[in-house]
């Protein structure tokens, strides 16, 4: 799809892959698969990717949601040949390097442990579990050991299943030129890419909301009780131990 609007010579390119938390086989698989795309490909390592995008004034966003993964590039039109080369490599040939993955996982574990001492974080986890139930992707809470189960092979499995040409939609917006469309079609539309060309399976989950009206959450450090949950039909009671 193309939305041609704006006066600045900038184009936004969005690639959507149908595959997110609802399709993953284990917690964090979809998130880290998407996150690691920029950490190394067959042609470029993480430093080269960052350097090239910075040099050409481009910006790359990676995100993963419940049913979709997103790869978004903002680029000046005059540098599209260079920035699209990086984008193509990121999407088609990531290598999920073990060293870089280990560093990112360790950093995320540390952040998880820090957040686990914060009341707002714990209260949010308690509320989503009460709303959706522990077997629903929205209520299945990530634990520390889930981070340690993330490996390059786990990410490669998810990538091979969902990151392919038969499961990719592309949206262009900004100052979209004919040259831009031609380049996108040449890179992503002329030849199939990926290994598994099946469409994602249709998965349905039904929330199992708790019948209780109070949620008790034990924390091991003194803290203040937040007041931001008044819109929910439960009372969150924080018990410090």
Language model features with spans:
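His/Glu-rich zincin catalytic helix
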Residues: 1-51, 156-241
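Charge-rich, well-structured scaffold segments of protease-associated domains
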Residues: 48-199
């Amino acid at each position: 799809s193309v939305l041609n609007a704006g006066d600045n010579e900038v184009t936004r390119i969005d690639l959507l892959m149908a595959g997110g938390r609802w399709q993953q086989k284990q917690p964090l698989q979809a998130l880290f698969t998407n996150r690691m795309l920029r950490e190394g490909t067959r042609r470029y390592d993480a430093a080269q990717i960052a350097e090239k995008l910075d040099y050409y004034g481009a910006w790359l966003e990676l995100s993963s949601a419940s049913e979709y993964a997103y790869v978004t590039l903002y680029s000046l039109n005059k540098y599209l040949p260079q920035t699209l080369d990086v984008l193509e490599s990121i999407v088609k040939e990531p290598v999920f390097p073990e060293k870089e993955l280990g560093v990112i996982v360790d950093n995320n574990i540390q952040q998880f442990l820090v957040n686990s001492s914060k009341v707002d974080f714990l209260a949010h986890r308690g509320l989503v579990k009460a709303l959706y139930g522990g077997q629903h992707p929205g209520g299945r809470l990530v634990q520390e050991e889930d981070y340690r189960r993330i490996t390059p092979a786990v990410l490669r499995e998810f990538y091979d299943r969902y990151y392919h040409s038969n499961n990719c939609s592309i949206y262009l917006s900004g100052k979209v030129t004919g040259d831009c469309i031609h380049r996108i079609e040449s890179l992503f539309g002329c030849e199939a890419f990926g290994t598994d060309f099946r469409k994602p399976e249709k998965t349905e989950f039904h929330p199992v909301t708790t019948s209780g009206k109070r949620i008790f959450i034990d924390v091991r450090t003194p803290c203040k009780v937040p007041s931001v949950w008044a819109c929910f039909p439960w009372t969150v009671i924080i018990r410090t131990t």
